[in-house]
Amino acid sequence: PVADVELSEIESAELAERDGGVCVGLPVAGAEVRIVPLGFGPESVPEPVAHGVTGEILVRAPWVSEGYLGLWATQRAARPGAGDWHRSGDVGHVDLAGRLWVEGRAAHVVDGAGGPVTSVPVERAVERALGLMRSAAVGVGPAGAQQLVVVVEQPDADAGPADAEIMARVRNEVAHPVAAVLSVPSLPVDVRHNAKIDRAAVAAWADTVLAGGRVKPNW
């Protein structure tokens, strides 16, 4: 475990910070959390960012595993500077009360010209506004100039651009500029959990559709 939180605290925290991601609470006794700038290399551990600033989540605790069996490249990336901080691969921030908020995976951050956009706050805002079970916020385009595209899961809709009303509601709800809103009958998820969205596949499909290519997804 890294953090702990009661349901009542989740509810009160999310009222105060509606689109901050998922509040997972204060670090448990013996665990340390550090939020560092996105995209740092494996040579050293950067200084933490300020409260409220999004970055990558590092964790240090006596019970954190010392390595990945047989995965040397993964081990090197996960332990920057050969220290005891572990790169979780998640992104988030710490609020003024010291609570940790998770905003998604580092691999899923949209790297746009206006700064990084994390997936979970966007998806939660869209799902709340439209009453959906699933959506995916992905980046299309080259790193540093990616455009934010939202793909919504609508079982009765055809794959392709969402209708004008859906587009307007998404753009009104999301705090970042949304380049396009697309619909699919279903989003690709892992077979084991039926929960983890394959955002790489969604981003590749969105890129193809917006370039005038095949609309039917291949999942």
Q: Where are the regions a protein language model picked out?
A:
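Conserved C-terminal "lid"/linker of ANL adenylate-forming enzymes
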Residues: 136-138, 149-150, 167-219
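Conserved AMP-binding/adenylate-forming
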Residues: 1-92, 96-97, 106-108
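Catalytic cores of large soluble enzymes that bind and process phosphate-bearing ligands
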Residues: 16, 25, 49-52, 60, ...
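AMP-binding/adenylate-forming catalytic core of the ANL superfamily
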Residues: 61, 66-67, 83-84, 89-177
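Short linear motifs in exposed loops
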Residues: 31, 104, 120, 192-193, ...
